[in-house]
């Protein structure tokens, strides 16, 4: 509670609760209510399993956005990742939150184990089913296009490129214009993108503070029990600017720097997210002319999709 209060007092506006599963913490209802009372905009990332009808009724008012993990298109494929008997419960929770008026999204990360020749059709059927049950209310569907490392598993760039192509085909099967819409949705009007988000504060369950939500790959900059929130907020701003496209090589001289924002500071930079053990200047190491040309084409195609000219 004190951390949230201090965050707000130092200019904080948005907070995301994740885990694990936030509802595993018994005082979560009091925490989300307190965040709402402070005027913070709250997002919750949940696996969807612990929500009762009463909890949804009691807490929906305090939640600005909720995202559920659903890593398959049905019970069979979801159980390969999340365990058996969970799929219908999560779908039901998704529908109830959307119908309660909360901005609701469904995040899906397929694995090679549960992808098959029928995934495109079955995923579209799932999307259509949820839309039908939510009476036209906006539910946002997100497909992860990158396999992140974890549990001693690491993926090569070539593997992720292959995976991304498969996922984009699934998206296109659901909505042939998805790539255009995703591009423009990721670029807010009149907002200059200078960073991937490095510098945003992530507080782990033990109070350690990181400046990216991929905390297992980052360094801690201290603990909220030992340093004031003002310190972390100032340090986060400092890191955000130091690693912005205006200050890294070769991005600072690229005409596309405010469109691509430089990419991930863990995956695409020489310091791999490890600020404290790295020295200036920082370098983007994954960009090339082929990627630039693809980005230019995607930008132009998206623009032409939304704006028609005689």
Where are these regions (language model features)?
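Alpha-helix termination/capping residues and helix-transition junctions
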Residues: 6-9, 60, 135, 248, ...
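Radical SAM enzyme [4Fe-4S]-AdoMet core and its adjacent flexible, acidic
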Residues: 60-65, 69-71, 76-210, 214-224
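Flexible loop residues that form catalytic
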Residues: 20, 48, 71, 146, ...
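Conserved alpha-helical substructure of the radical SAM core
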Residues: 1-62
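N-terminal pre-triad scaffold of radical SAM enzymes
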Residues: 7, 12-17, 199-203, 207, ...
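Flexible mid-to-C-terminal extensions adjoining Fe-S/redox cofactors in radical SAM and related proteins
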Residues: 214-310
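Residue-level signal for the nucleotide or nucleotide-sugar donor/cofactor binding architecture
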Residues: 26, 85, 249
């Amino acid at each position: 509670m004190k951390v949230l209060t201090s965050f707000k007092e130092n200019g904080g506006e948005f907070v995301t609760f994740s885990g694990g599963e936030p509802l595993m913490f018994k005082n979560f209802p009091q925490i989300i209510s307190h965040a709402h009372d402070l005027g913070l905009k709250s997002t919750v990332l949940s696996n969807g399993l612990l929500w009762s009808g009463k909890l949804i009724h009691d807490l929906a008012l305090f939640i600005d956005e909720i995202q559920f993990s659903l890593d398959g298109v049905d019970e069979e494929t979801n159980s390969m990742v999340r365990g058996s008997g969970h799929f219908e419960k999560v779908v039901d929770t998704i529908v109830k939150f959307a119908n309660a008026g909360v901005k609701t999204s469904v995040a899906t990360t397929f694995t090679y184990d549960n992808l098959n020749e029928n995934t495109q059709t079955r995923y579209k059927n799932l999307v259509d089913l949820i839309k039908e049950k939510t009476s036209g209310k906006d539910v946002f569907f997100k497909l992860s296009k990158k396999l992140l490392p974890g549990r001693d598993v690491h993926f090569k760039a070539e593997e992720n490129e292959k995976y991304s192509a498969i996922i984009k085909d699934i998206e296109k099967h659901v909505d042939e214009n998805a790539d255009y819409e995703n591009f423009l949705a990721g670029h807010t009007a009149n907002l200059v993108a200078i960073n991937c988000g490095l510098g945003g504060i992530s507080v782990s369950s033990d109070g350690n503070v990181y400046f990216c939500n991929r905390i297992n790959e980052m360094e801690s900059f201290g603990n909220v029990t030992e340093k004031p929130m003002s310190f972390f907020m100032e340090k986060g701003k400092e890191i955000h600017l130091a690693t912005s496209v205006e200050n890294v090589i070769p991005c600072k001289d690229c005409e596309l720097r405010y469109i691509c924002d430089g990419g991930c500071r863990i995956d695409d930079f020489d310091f791999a997210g490890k600020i404290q053990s790295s020295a200036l200047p920082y370098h983007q190491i994954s960009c090339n002319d082929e990627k630039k040309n693809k980005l230019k084409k995607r930008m132009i195609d998206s623009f032409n999709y939304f704006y028609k000219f005689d």
